[in-house]
Amino acid sequence: MKNQFVLLLLAIVFLQMIFQSDAILSAIWSGIKSLFGKRGLENMDKFDELFDGDLSEADLDFLKELMR
């Protein structure tokens, strides 16, 4: 009974490793494809202005209005 339980645990661990490595490899492959794809070599600096980490006074006022 103990041997069966140990074999079951090992099988679960190995299957989990296989599925997780498959997900990681597919994510890496899609990243490589996007780098060398048609749009992958474009200049992506235009997206740097989309995120502004600082909150201005007007932003804080707007958030206060939303929370009322």
Curated annotation (Swiss-Prot):
* Propeptide residues according to the Swiss-Prot or TrEMBL record: 40-68
What keywords tag this UniProt record? Answer: Amidation, Antibiotic, Antimicrobial, Cleavage on pair of basic residues, Cytolysis, Hemolysis, Membrane, Secreted, Signal, Target cell membrane, Target membrane, Transmembrane
Q: Which residues form the signal peptide?
A: 1-23
Q: Does the keyword Signal belong to this entry?
A: yes
Q: Does the keyword Secreted apply?
A: yes
Residues that the record marks as modified (Phenylalanine amide) are 36
Q: What is its main location?
A: secreted
Q: How is it modified after translation?
A: The non-amidated UyCT3 does not show antimicrobial activity.
Which tissues is it found in, per the record? Expressed by the venom gland.
> Where is the protein localized?
Secreted; Target cell membrane
Any single biological process term in GO: defense response to bacterium
Q: Which GO terms describe its cellular component?
A: extracellular region; membrane; other organism cell membrane
UniProt similarity note: Belongs to the non-disulfide-bridged peptide (NDBP) superfamily. Short antimicrobial peptide (group 4) family.
Task: Write out the function statement from the record.
Answer: Antimicrobial peptide that inhibits the growth of Gram-positive (S.aureus, MIC=10 uM) and Gram-negative bacteria (E.coli, MIC=15 uM and P.aeruginosa, MIC=6 uM). It also shows 35% of hemolysis when 15 uM are tested (95% at 50 uM).
Query: What protein name is recorded for this chain?
Result: Antimicrobial peptide UyCT3
Identify the taxonomic lineage of the organism of origin: Eukaryota, Metazoa, Ecdysozoa, Arthropoda, Chelicerata
